[in-house]
Amino acid sequence: MAERANLVFQNKEIDGTAMKRLISRLIDHFGMGYTSHILDQIKTLGFHQATTTSISLGIEDLLTIPSKGWLVQDAEQQSFLLEKHYYYGAVHAVEKLRQSVEIWYATSEYLKHEMNSNFRITDPSNPVYLMSFSGARGNASQVHQLVGMRGLMADPQGQMIDLPIQSNLREGLSLTEYIISCYGARKGVVDTAVRTADAGYLTRRLVEVVQHIIVRRRDCGTIQAISVSPQNGMTEKLFVQTLIGRVLANDIYIGSRCIATRNQDIGIGLVNRFITTFRAQPFRAQPIYIRTPFTCRSTSWICQLCYGRSSTHGDLVELGEAVGVIAGQSIGEPGTQLTLRTFHTGGVFTGGTADLVRSPSNGKIQFNGDLVHPTRTRHGQPAFLCYIDLHITIQSQDILHSVTIPSKSLILVQNDQYVESEQVIAEIRAGTSALHFKEKVQKHIYSESDGEMHWSTDVYHAPEYQYGNLRRLPKTSHLWILSVSMCRSSIASFSLHKDQDQMNTYSFSVDGRYIFGLSMADDEVRHRLLDTFGKKDREILDYSTPDRIMSNGHWNFVYPSILQNNFDLLAKKRRNRFAIPLQYHQEQEKEPISCFGISIEIPFMGVLRRNTIVAYFDDPRYKKDKKGSGIVKFRYRTLEDEYRTREKDSENEYGSPENEYRTREEECKTLEDEYRTREEEYETLEDEYGIPENEYETLEDEYGILEDEYRTREEESEDEYGSPENKYRPREDKYGTLEEDSEDEHGTLEEDSEEDSEDEYGNPEEDSVLKKGVLIEHRGTKEFSLKYQKEVDRFFFILQELHILPRSSSLKVLDNSIIGVDTQLTKNTRSRLGGLVRVKRKKSHTELKIFSGDIHFPEEADKILGGSLIPLEREKKDSKESKKRENWVYVQWKKILKSKEKYFVLVRPAVAYEMNEGRNLATLFPQDLLQEEGNLQLRLVNFISHENSKLTQRIYHTNSQFVRTCLVLNWEQEEKEEARASLVEIRANGLIRDFLRIGLIKSTISYTRKRYDSRSAGLILHNRLDRTNTNSFYSKAKIQSLSQHQEAIGTLLNRNKEYQSLMVLSASNCSRIGFFKNSKNPNGVKESNPRIPIPKFFGLFRNFSGLLGTIAPSISNFSSSYYLLTYNQILLKKHLLLDNLKQNFKVLQGLKHSLINENQRTSNFDSNIMLDPFQLNWHFLPHDSWEETSAKIHLGQFICENVCLFKSHIKKSGQIFIVNIDSFVIRAAKPYLATTGATVHGHYGEILYKGDRLVTFIYEKARSSDITQGLPKVEQIFEARSIDSLSPNLERRIEDWNERIPRILGGPWGFLIGAELTIAQSRISLVNKIQKVYRSQGVQIHNRHIEIIIRQVTSKVRVSEDGMSNVFSPGELIGLLRAERAGRALDESIYYRAILLGITRVSLNTQSFISEASFQETARVLAKAALRGRIDWLKGLKENVVLGGIIPVGTGFQKFVHRYPQDKNLYFEIQKKKLFASEMRDILFLHTELVSSDSDVTNNFYETSESPFTPFI
């Protein structure tokens, strides 16, 4: 008893680690036998004590935490604020997600800490508390889920679900929470991540790889080693774990004294000596070289010294031990623990966030303000940063609390502020934590409602790809979804139009857009609206042209139409154009469109180059019929250069023949292309269509224009059209004539038609007329006299249809057959014309042509003229009534088959169009336009918009324009490269004059606005920044400078008084000055001061379907000299206000698509987007707010909710839609904030439906360290798959090392050393990664087990093709050691590269085919082995088990080992090699020292750096 009394009583808790230490010390002191007796007594004692008290787990023991209620409430409040910010557009979706995750994670963690103290204080003997915190079962996270809250969940892909589970398992989950928690459940229906990585299967594969690894020798004689040094910041614990049980590869000296020799195993005593030495002399300490399984020279076994001590009895491993199977099971067995552990924790998210410090009580907070300086938190909220540890005191009524905040933390409250209990007062920054792997994640944002997309000017308007609708954001900006309610009816149920408004409206139909012109007085608008839609004979306008000009009796409106693929035209050219509707023609009432407009184009900044087209117009009389596609034929002179045959690029234009028209249509870049009905698309296909290049020359003889004449003005026309600003320049390089090829390429038609034209050239005097009979005869009379013509007199349109079909399509019609209209050609296509069918098969496709008309078989072949255009009946020469004659025919000469001399004549109807000869500048423009000044000249040029003899295809229900007239500008002064153009409107005594002033002197007005194109900016371009340079208009001198230059060409338009002035200018900051006197205002405003200049700014926005202009009203009774109003902003200052301003001030409001004039609002309304009255919010301005605030509101401005513009807040975010005197209307809109680099889906002004994708964010997030990733991660590494996005896939890294290292070293040695270094590098990296996963789970596995597996995974090399070898075939997988030995034996270098195989592939690439066959694919493996005649030497365990032999381990090892008699002499050989070994080591194997360490594992052995050779790269 006395002895027992003297013993020290250890009153400490003992855990697993302490037990391990105790047992190892007992074994050291007493040996194995005696220790087992002691442990039995401890076990008996434990069982006895455990059963004396019974702990039962009841539901009452699950105590919920009292503080949970207000903690959750606090988090909900923060989430609500965050949601509000998101709703206002202040934070974007990713930011909201991140903050939401942090709020709930911090709440959950705080609740977990509270749970611990709550148990400890209230019920320390609580069974749940005892069970989990003693480590017996479960952990804190599981108990937290039982009694705290489950918190945020991660789905199987590791993505966060941002809806937290607020309940715990004690309270029970709601249905939503249950479904979310199912995502975290393992082995459930939802989970897919773990199913593939079953622990048992992993163990099986691991054992399969290494089952043949047996300790067969004492020493393999290796001279390689791996260095371990604690100098790199390696922890002592890790250092000890690494060294214990290993064998030294070198003698170790301290000074000159040797303390350990080579091949000595390292025990705890030796390690302690190493540690004390390192502590004493940290800088002089040398690294310790140890042997590992990696360094063993054997191929299919391992030696005692490379393996080291056995884990079971602490001595060197015995010969015949199956260490491979032990290694496989050691790694596979904790996998079951990992799986079980993931099941218990259930996918609960664990992320790294900052710790929060909360106030212990209510009170006043105080700290030294000099020690902090203001900053912002990562979420943008204001905070203070403390550099050093900061002491904070909280003074409550009766107690003083003191809190110490560590350095680099954020203080979230101000000094002397009153704080409440549990309020967050500081945020502690987490220390330099381990490097978290980050991954790039895409987050899609979807529209929450139907609406129309708008964005600010910060978005690129050209899409990222040519045909795509994706745009990258160059900087952070807002997207707005304007509310609409979709409605198909064309009559508005709710209208914002006031009395006396003019409106144009049109509807959508299935196959195109129909636009109706309303020509009537104002008061008739209401009645005519209803019956416009009933008439069938309305003109169908071109769905794809950018602008249409229409008139309603007062104005010419410009209608941009919508086509999804052409609204970026302007953006691509980086030019800003605008069209001005200027003239109205009364004579043209009978035509479908009641006017034709002169469109004036002025490029961005108003700079005109030489030979620029400044204006053009399209005459509606020259519009193509709706009948279909066909050929335009004419004879030209002046524009011969521009419209030469364009054949060169026809072959390569053929991408996918079926979609030829559509895809080419999308490619057009400028507005002119649209006007010319996509001339390029059809011209370039000439070769393929089989219309001979010289066919149109037949017209030459008819019109009597000689060949040489028709080239006379080539250079001049090139001069006219060569301007880079202009699309109509000649393209000599692209479209040269190609006469030789056309004969060979195009088969029968071309040969025959060539004969035709020769035939016709032989009779140049004759013209042909078709009689009523079948024969065609020659007549000698000429209808036209030979005269010199500058322009084309007449052109013809001949119907023809072409189908380009895939090669594989089956035709339902025969070649040379006659078909009717609407005949089925293939399964999906029908003919639009009737007539002769010609089929031509090409390599890639089939062409099917349909020629309309009749077929005649002539009796005498020599009298027939092919390719002629013939009038059916005579007309007098002076007859001008009929501009369009449909009574011509076109005669074509065809051969039925190439081989037979059988001819027939195809007579095709043609439509003739006469050109207007008498038109000149005077007929188009007022007379004073011709007063040219200052060397500027204008020329009028007509041209035909189609290539001669080219097929023009019908597009939808379009009407193409055949003829366009252009106004071309030129000047003589050589030194002037460019002219400046601007538009001015002058009103004097009520007469309005519009001037287009073009001068050679640079204008004084500065153009500061950015470029805006067809879809750029919603209603008004700038919601935040006003980029107008208003200063240039503030002084009178600058205003008058507009008229300083005298080189005005003259007015473009004279109008009478009753036509109000309407100018639509571009957003390129053109201005106009209105001088007015005695103007009458409809509201009875008094006469304004005479000659007050009011600059008026306009914006033309080609929005979804119309124009927007805003106007400044006339303001009376101002004492100041002038008043500036830009973009309808109400900009009021107190000193400008007079008493009667409230009554007289009138702001005119404009709809989204509207034109506004001085006296009344004119709008056109897209009836397809009906505005719901409930989505428009009227916001009334208080009457007295005018004097108190100078806030600016303007039409089209986007306003976020709760912005305080006036006395009251804005109740809903949206766009200002109508501005009245005392109120304005907001169209409801939802803002979305999008960050730089985000991708916007969709087009500006596009209608989106609820759930459509709006934006895609790409952001980096720390990879959540969810426990589910334990086992799959290990399995991924073993299978050599990519495991994280930061370090590239190991296979790719090995490829890099394979390439770089031989290149650095050079020569045949490079491959040997390169493969060695690569394999060593990848092995160390892999071991570290696997250990990292296991250690994160608290599982300890000895490195040597992992090393044995990794050794097999990395032991193969692939023979490369660089050097041919007689032994191995290129691409063959061989063991590294085998490759080295073969190279030494053959005295020739074998070139090979290191390769990383996964464990499954290694199992199928062993020396034993019986082992492979028992693993997978048995039949295939055995068949291949039989064919190759493979021999299995039965060295492994599995082969012997399968065949029922004795396995070569344990007792069966003895007879196996006698095969090696040379084993005895091995030791002496090693001694002899020592000298050579030291030299070799210097050359080759000290590469391990190059390895840099990682901060996590921090020694050379545990390295994870990208490449050890970074300096060389």
UniProtKB/Swiss-Prot annotation:
Subcellular location field: Plastid, Chloroplast
Region (Disordered): 644-769
Residues annotated as binding Zn(2+): C220, C296, C303, C306
Cofactor annotation comment: Binds 1 Zn(2+) ion per subunit.
Superkingdom, natural source: Eukaryota
Keywords linked to the UniProt accession: Chloroplast, DNA-directed RNA polymerase, Metal-binding, Nucleotidyltransferase, Plastid, Transcription, Transferase, Zinc
Pfam family, one: RNA_pol_Rpb1_5
Example GO molecular function: zinc ion binding
Name of this chain's protein: DNA-directed RNA polymerase subunit beta''
Naturally occurring in which organism (per UniProt): Oryza nivara (Indian wild rice)
Gene that this polypeptide is encoded by: rpoC2
